[in-house]
Amino acid sequence: MKLLGLLISAFGAINALKIKALYLSCDYELRPYNAVIDSQCMAFALNGSNIHEAIRYLNAMNIDKAYVLYWNDHDLHQNPMVLHKNGALAPFDRYTNTAKHVLCVEACSCPGPQSRPVVCPENNGASVSSPCPPCGQGNNTTVCDKVVVNPQPVKPLPAPCTPCAPCESSSSEKSESKECMTFPRICKKKCGPRHGRSPKKVEIVKSQKTYTFDIERYKRRGDVVVRVCSQDCKDKFEKFVLTKTGEIRKGKDKKCIPEPLPECLQCPKNLYKLKSGIEAKVCSEVCMYINSKCEIFVLIGDCDFYKVVMNERRRKQSSFHLKKIRGQKLRELIRQGLFGVEFSPLKC
């Protein structure tokens, strides 16, 4: 009985602490328990008496879902549960049900570098200690979300969140922009005699293209110098001028006929504005890609892939939203290969 009383007291002490969310980087997204240990946190013990406070916390911080490592007296660090902000509690599944946060009750430092879109949280009626987290902290620093859930009558709401400050400059204006990863399409070709006992040889061919638009020249004249780097077993470079009317002007070498540009790249002005708008929204540099279907994707940080979906019903050309790609869809997208799209001055 004494042991039971001590356990009840311990759980009561834990529940009395402030709920905090630990943001998980890519290395910890599937191992939330390791993130809690490495950050010297105490895992939050969820039960029937505090689940409503946890739900109010998620809504106050605008967090869709978070890992829970303890439910009542059950240790779930091997197979955690995922608590959604609508109140649903479901088992963890690495393909269909993951989270970017884990609930804890101790002051913790977020483990590892990470990059994520910074959004000012909306207050849904809970008392928030820091309504607007700082924006534009960079890719190597992060701030743990902190909120105080007050079960007492709610005080008047604080002033609306001010918009995130714009990023210092876009990636195309920096002298040293980060190098984007490449995602070549890998094909296997069989060669050798079709008949006979000799084995067939398999040749692996990597196909990759990167389109670079000289936006500096575009600002001066309206024309854009385009450089296409193709990597099919060996590097091949093409360079031509794309006029503001969409016409391709060939160089001095008349024998060189540039390949036609994909339709989504024929108006680099709008594409450049789209990328700048995305970078201003997430307060971070992004890498832009297209696939063979001319669909546009961006990579934020080192592991967050998003599909850019344009809102055609709205009149503004810059109206878009980002749809995260993960799991089997992401693996299939990378397997089929992606073409890089960059905006920077051409040195040659």
UniProtKB/Swiss-Prot annotation:
Glycans are attached at residues 47, 139-140. The keyword Signal applies. GO terms for biological process: cell adhesion; sporulation resulting in formation of a cellular spore. It comes from the Eukaryota. A motif (HBM1) lies at residues 193-198. Keywords: Cell adhesion, Glycoprotein, Signal, Sporulation. Residues 1-16 form the signal peptide. Spore wall protein involved in the adhesion to host cells surface glycoaminoglycans (GAGs). Microsporidian spore adherence is an integral part of activation and host cell infection. Heparin-binding motifs (HBM) are characterized by an XBBXBX or XBBBXXBX sequence, where X is any neutral amino acid and B is a positively charged basic amino acid, and are defined as the consensus sequence necessary for protein-heparin interactions. HBM motifs may be involved in spore adherence to host cells. This is Spore wall and anchoring disk complex protein EnP1. It comes from Encephalitozoon intestinalis. The gene is EnP1.
